[in-house]
Amino acid sequence: MNPALPRHIAVLKGGPSEEREISLRTAKAVEDALSSLGYEISSIDVTTEKFEIPRDAEICFLCIHGSFGEDGQIQRLLMRRGIPFTGSDASSSEKAFDKAWSKTLFIKGGIPTPPFCVVGDGKKIPFDPPYVIKPSRQGSSIGIEFVYDIKELDQAIKKSTQYDHVVLAEALITGKELTVGILDGKALPVVEIKPKEGFYDYHHKYTKGASTYFCPAPLTVDQTSAVQKTALDAFNVLGCSVYGRVDIILSDNGIPWVLEINTIPGMTETSLFPMAAKASGMNFAQLCEKILEISYLRWKAHG
């Protein structure tokens, strides 16, 4: 345990979103890791805004995925209470969670991102299929539909609308599925994702053996550099901080297309962020403590 860091950590987990079960798995792994280093842990299952944090808990380790955890809500509540927490602030979390907003900012910042538009109410999509239809504010590939024939579009939009009233149509870019962890302003080794079949959906993300991963990804030096730079640029464009994960498709013509940023990436037994950290020489407990350290020092410096 680092004596310069708070001893008592409140781990906030659960939440009301579709990603609740993944959050509980992330929290369990984080709690076990920090406990093994000697930290005192208060595990708090957050179901409403009226959660209680022990008075002597000195910082919150946020493990809530999806709405209320990654959309800026819980960060804003903690900021009002004057309680330190891990990860990005409320504003950058909100931008990253809203795909329509973040992709608009990527375009303004010169970051490659697949063409997209908000759909519904009879709006015409200004590019041809295939499309990826997705809720603007949802994570873990929940609510995503693939459309290859325009006849399938209305049904796909209807399905995605179950998860958010704002739905995007995005051009389907084919290529290598990659993800890049960002930690303390630096890009971690790139991970390549190969689902055993189909696309990297919720099932392939959280089922052991459903996907194969390569870390570091088998890319050329130039490809690796371009992917890491693009990921870091995207992270900075949204004002994110401490840590996160950037999902990218590297197309056959060498363009790294940014799909989205996860400000509270999964930390489960199948998660990619810890895999990338391990490839850089950092075990899971060290990673959790590093996130704690960066977040706490940032809070002390800026509040």
Swiss-Prot record:
InterPro entries: ATP-grasp, ATP_grasp_subdomain_1, D-Ala_lig_Van_CS, D_ala_D_ala, Dala_Dala_lig_C, PreATP-grasp_dom_sf. Its cofactor is Mg(2+); Mn(2+). Mg(2+) 2 binds at E260, N262. It is found in: Cytoplasm. GO terms for molecular function: ATP binding; D-alanine-D-alanine ligase activity; metal ion binding. Its EC number is 6.3.2.4. Pathway: Cell wall biogenesis; peptidoglycan biosynthesis. Residues 103-293 form the ATP-grasp domain. Belongs to the D-alanine--D-alanine ligase family. Cell wall formation. This is D-alanine--D-alanine ligase. The gene is ddl.
